[in-house]
Amino acid sequence: AMLDIGEASELDITEKDFDFVYNINVKGAFYGLKYVMPIMKQQKAGSIVNTASVAGLIGSPNMMLYNSSKHALMGINKVAALEAAPFNVRVNTVNPGVINTQMMRNIESKVAPGAAEAAQAAYNDAVPMKRYGEPEEVANVITFLLSDEATYVSSSSFTIDGALYNV
């Protein structure tokens, strides 16, 4: 989840902000794994896909909480995948980049108050494919990872960002 706490340097982050972001992005995934993994292990089958972000692969100024929480989620998934593999349970991560969602509308408005269209144009220009991804494009990757077509895919991270991460 991209959380609405605004951008802040590490010196301005409060404990309340820290807890808010980590409770959702890290604890939420942790508890999901904690309570579903035993069932999947017992069934000797299952697939879990958690959504991190391109932000979990990089660092961004004034985005310490969001970026670091997504890094943490990716680490949790790596360990969970190793622990679940002997039980035929798969754990993977998707890392969306700039996706055409309400979250991006909020970011555009914050980055360029009163000029959201200019912000959107700048984001489009930054992406090598010159466009935002669509939610369905992320959903298609998740659908594949959850399907029987991906039974040997685990501990993997899939970046869906129009090659932005390579820039």
Each predicted region: which residue ranges?
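Substrate-binding pocket helix/loop in short-chain dehydrogenase/reductase
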Residues: 6-10, 14-19, 119, 123
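Short, small/polar-rich loop/turn modules that mediate ligand/substrate recognition or access, typified
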Residues: 85, 90, 153-155
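Catalytic Tyr-X3-Lys loop
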Residues: 11-30, 49, 73, 129
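Short C-terminal tail/terminal secondary-structure segment
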Residues: 58, 143, 154-167
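Active-site loop-to-helix junction immediately N-terminal to the catalytic Tyr of the SDR YXXXK motif
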Residues: 8, 13, 59-67, 79, ...
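Active-site helix of classical SDR
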Residues: 33, 69, 77
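Alpha-helical segment proximal to the catalytic Tyr-Lys
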Residues: 38, 82-83, 151
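Residue(s) in the substrate-gating loop at a strand-loop-helix junction
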Residues: 53
